[in-house]
């Protein structure tokens, strides 16, 4: 019964303020509550501290069953909210919940969420829908008011600027890194499997995924998007905080593309943008911006960067070419005066620190050797401000810097100071910004005299500089020569010691000209990059006392010694022959891929290691050393060099300017094939050297094919014939030679060299029976000489006959 009376009384009472309702009003009808809200909204005097209807409040408190005699208005109930917790959707697909607290504004509540995520609240707006184009809510209202009128318990925080600056999402794909790459998080190599962003190329391990940045680097996408550049310009000019610095960094990196002159190009590309922090994951570092990049135009349309937002526009930034030229003349006069004073200061007491001090701008220190290419006479000294929001009034483009002011204050009374004072009014200055003025001490820019210790250090003679050595050059005191191994057409080979056993080849070069030395260094630069299993390792070169090269020592002997010198001569099996030819083709194909022509390929330069399974090619390259020139009629003519038995016909004729081609090495390889297959040198029946040169050069003479071993496969013989073709265009390259060698198939079983064993047996017996019975010959055979009696002789004859038939499978 009391419950019914409570409903009637509550329905009959006057509506109360939504700011101080009783918790028991939950059972009120919806129409009553909505009418309360509408009436309360229309009241201009609504206040969260004083109820609109105190009588109704007292009646509600009396209905609640509490005794409020004399204190009914002082004891207030907490307000009624439609939602106690509101879901807030933050930028970059983040979300959080905010509690509706009395008296807390929406700005304060949502700013806490944004600041925890390093998001600038001033760049954001709050809407009641996911669409950022809808009307934003008033952040000065309390969360109570917003919660009352919120259709759903959700709010959306939108920021066009933040999406522009850092909302480019990664396109992460799984990648196999061969060869391994360094992880951009921990800098350790990524072995095989890892992850990479297809947009910004950010690489990381799976274990480092939690430390990877959530968004891409803008430098990968901004150059392709003009609208994005304009938005970045707006951020850099109208906002403050970390987003402004990010926008300036990106625009500084893009300055050569957007509005910056070529002379103001930054020194180098930006470094790695990420570094690992054990407590906070990856932090993006700002780029090291050069003074030219930082003073470059932020907008492609205007010549000067826009100042930070202020109440008054910058009306003094005048794009006047005459003003720039006038300022340049002032700076030229200042530099001339400074050089004149330095020339008079011979004792060093008043040496200007302008040449010693590193050039810096806005706190970024550059090397002292680098000058401002736009205005090389300005030495930009930092103002020493600790406030990140403070700015200095300076002429556009950095024409008038603090060092110029410092020079005028430090050299008072001189021509320089008067010149500066006379022209200061002609320089355009930007209006003061909202930041407080900075106090600059004139003594900060004063030139310092040398101390006595510095004067003594300057007069002390410096030790002579050591001679500069080229890359991969080995000094004479770093290696030791043991004994001579052999000599060839281009030099003499010695065995020596250079951090291990090496081969030292002294080249037949006497007094090389500067051009020949330069060509030799270029070839050495190519040789030092060769790395292959079938190529001797190049270790360096020697300049003094004689030009020499140092290579890997081969613990074995050459193929020439194995075939023609050692006794007994080694006759390789056909499988070993093909394996040797394959390895030579592999090494030569690698050298030709590096544009290295051997010019002297022969069995003397093909080495077999001690294991007899690895082939090494040596004495390759060095065209400068292997070229001889003669003077004929005042003109230099190239002469053929090398060993004539392995020389290609076009090299012998020397009709072309450069007869050495990959096909000339293929011809030499064909002669090496002949040596291995025949165990003879070509043209061994001709003793006249000139006759060999003439006949081979004309195509009249080829190696004798009749001396090649008979078990040579036909496909290998055809390859040999193609390699020694007279026309070099008909010869294959080493890539094709290698494929044809791999296609050669040898029989697995070889023919027996012994006489065949023919078994005669009757057809009624199987072969297995004949074999089994033949094993019993030794036990059943009795020689005839053992017979003593006629009976034993007859028995022996019968046994011999049985053994005979047993041997031939007749029993």
From Swiss-Prot:
Q: Which residues form the RBD domain?
A: 84-160
Cofactor: record remark: Binds 2 Zn(2+) ions per subunit.
- Report the stretches of sequence that form zinc fingers (Phorbol-ester/DAG-type): 169-216
GO molecular-function terms, A-Z? ATP binding; MAP kinase kinase kinase activity; protein serine kinase activity; zinc ion binding
Q: Compositionally biased, Basic and acidic residues: which spans?
A: 55-78, 451-460
- Domain called Protein kinase: residue spans: 479-744
**Positions bound to Zn(2+) 2:** 183, 186, 205, 208
| Positions of the catalytic residues | 600
An example GO biological process term is: MAPK cascade
According to UniProt, the reaction catalysed is:
L-seryl-[protein] + ATP = O-phospho-L-seryl-[protein] + ADP + H(+); L-threonyl-[protein] + ATP = O-phospho-L-threonyl-[protein] + ADP + H(+)
A single GO CC term, please?
Answer: cytoplasm
* Positions annotated to bind Zn(2+) 1: 170, 197, 200, 216
Residues in coiled coil: none
The prosthetic group or cofactor this protein requires is: Zn(2+)
- The Polar residues compositionally biased stretches are 7-19
- Which residues make up the binding site for ATP? 485-493, 505
Annotated region Disordered: the residues are 1-78, 287-314, 384-412, 427-471
**Mind listing the UniProt keywords for this protein, alphabetically?**
ATP-binding, Developmental protein, Differentiation, Kinase, Meiosis, Metal-binding, Nucleotide-binding, Oogenesis, Serine/threonine-protein kinase, Transferase, Zinc, Zinc-finger
Similarity remark: Belongs to the protein kinase superfamily. TKL Ser/Thr protein kinase family. RAF subfamily.
Its subunit composition reads: Interacts with cdf-1 in a zinc-dependent manner which promotes its activity.
The protein's name is: Raf homolog serine/threonine-protein kinase
Q: In which organism is this protein found?
A: Caenorhabditis briggsae
The beginning of the lineage is:
Eukaryota, Metazoa, Ecdysozoa, Nematoda, Chromadorea
């Amino acid at each position: 019964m009391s419950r019914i009376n409570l409903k009637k009384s509550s329905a009959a009472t006057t509506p109360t303020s939504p700011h101080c309702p009783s918790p028991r009003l939950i059972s009120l009808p919806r129409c009553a509550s909505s009418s309360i809200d509408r009436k309360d909204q229309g009241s201009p005097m609504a206040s969260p501290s004083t109820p609109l209807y105190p009588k109704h409040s007292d009646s509600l408190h009396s209905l609640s069953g509490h005794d409020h005699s004399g204190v009914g208005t002082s004891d207030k109930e907490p307000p009624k909210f439609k939602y106690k917790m509101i879901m807030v959707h933050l930028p970059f697909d983040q979300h959080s919940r905010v509690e509706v607290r009395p008296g807390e504004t929406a700005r304060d509540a949502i700013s806490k969420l944004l600041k925890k995520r390093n998001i600038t609240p001033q760049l954001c707006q709050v809407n009641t829908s996911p669409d950022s184009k809808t009307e934003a809510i008033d952040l000065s209202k309390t969360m109570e008011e917003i919660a009352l009128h919120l259709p759903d318990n959700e709010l959306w925080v939108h920021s066009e600027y933040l999406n522009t600056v850092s909302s480019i999402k990664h396109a992460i794909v799984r990648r196999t890194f061969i060869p391994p790459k360094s992880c951009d998080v921990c800098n350790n190599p990524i072995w095989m499997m890892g992850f990479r962003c297809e947009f910004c190329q950010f690489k990381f391990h799976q274990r480092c995924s939690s430390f990877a940045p959530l968004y891409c680097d803008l430098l990968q996408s901004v150059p392709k998007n003009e609208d994005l550049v304009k938005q970045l310009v707006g951020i850099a000019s109208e906002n403050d905080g970390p987003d402004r610095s990010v926008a300036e960094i990106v625009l500084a990196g893009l300055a050569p593309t957007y509005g910056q002159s070529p002379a103001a190009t930054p020194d180098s590309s930006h470094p790695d943008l990420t570094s690992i922090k054990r407590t906070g994951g990856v932090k993006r570092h700002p780029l090291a911006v050069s003074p030219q990049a930082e003073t470059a135009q932020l907008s492609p349309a205007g010549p000067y960067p826009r100042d930070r937002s202020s109440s008054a526009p910058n009306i003094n930034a005048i794009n006047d070419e005459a003003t720039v030229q006038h300022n340049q003349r002032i700076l030229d006069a200042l530099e001339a005066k400074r050089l004149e004073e330095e020339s008079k200061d011979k004792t060093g007491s008043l040496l200007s620190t302008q040449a010693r001090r590193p050039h810096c701008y806005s706190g970024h220190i550059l090397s002292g050797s680098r000058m401002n290419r736009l205005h090389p006479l300005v030495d930009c000294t930092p103002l020493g401000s600790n406030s990140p929001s403070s700015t200095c009034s300076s002429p556009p483009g950095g024409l008038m810097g603090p060092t110029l002011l410092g020079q005028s204050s430090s050299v008072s009374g001189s021509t320089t100071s008067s010149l500066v004072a006379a022209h200061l009014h002609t320089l355009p200055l930007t209006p003061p910004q909202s930041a407080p003025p900075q106090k600059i001490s004139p003594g900060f820019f004063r030139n310092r005299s040398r101390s006595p210790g510095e004067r003594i250090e300057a007069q002390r003679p410096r030790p002579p500089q050591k001679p500069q050595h080229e890359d991969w050059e080995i000094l004479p005191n770093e290696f030791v020569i043991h004994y001579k191994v052999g000599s060839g057409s281009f030099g003499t080979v010695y065995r020596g010691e250079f951090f291990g056993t090496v081969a030292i080849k002294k080249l037949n070069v006497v007094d090389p000209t500067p051009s020949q030395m330069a060509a030799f260094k270029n070839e050495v630069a190519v040789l030092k990059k060769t790395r292959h299993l079938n190529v001797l390792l190049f270790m360096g070169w020697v300049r003094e006392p004689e030009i020499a090269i140092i290579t890997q020592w081969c613990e074995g002997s050459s193929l020439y010694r194995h075939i023609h010198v050692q006794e007994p001569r080694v006759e390789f099996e056909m499988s070993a022959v093909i394996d040797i030819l394959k390895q030579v083709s592999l090494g030569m194909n690698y050298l030709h891929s590096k544009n290295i022509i051997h010019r002297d390929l022969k069995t003397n330069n093909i080495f077999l290691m001690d294991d007899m399974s690895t082939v090494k090619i040596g004495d390759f390259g060095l065209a400068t050393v292997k070229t001889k020139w003669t003077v004929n009629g005042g003109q230099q003519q190239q002469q053929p060099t090398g060993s004539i038995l392995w020389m290609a016909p076009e090299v012998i004729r020397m009709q072309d300017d450069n007869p050495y081609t990959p096909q000339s090495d293929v011809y030499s390889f064909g002669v090496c094939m002949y040596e291995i297959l025949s165990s003879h040198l070509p043209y061994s029946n001709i003793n006249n050297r000139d006759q060999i040169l003439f006949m081979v050069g004309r195509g009249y003479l080829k190696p004798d094919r009749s001396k090649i071993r008979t078990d040579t496969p036909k496909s290998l013989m055809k390859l040999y014939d193609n390699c020694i073709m007279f026309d070099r265009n008909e010869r294959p390259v080493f890539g094709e030679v290698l494929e044809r060698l791999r296609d050669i198939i040898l029989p697995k079983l070889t023919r027996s060299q012994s006489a065949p064993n023919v078994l005669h047996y009757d057809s009624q017996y199987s072969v297995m029976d004949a074999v089994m019975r033949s094993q019993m010959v030794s036990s059943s055979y009795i020689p005839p000489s053992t017979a003593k009696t006629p009976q034993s002789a007859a028995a022996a004859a019968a046994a011999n006959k049985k053994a005979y038939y047993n041997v031939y499978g007749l029993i």
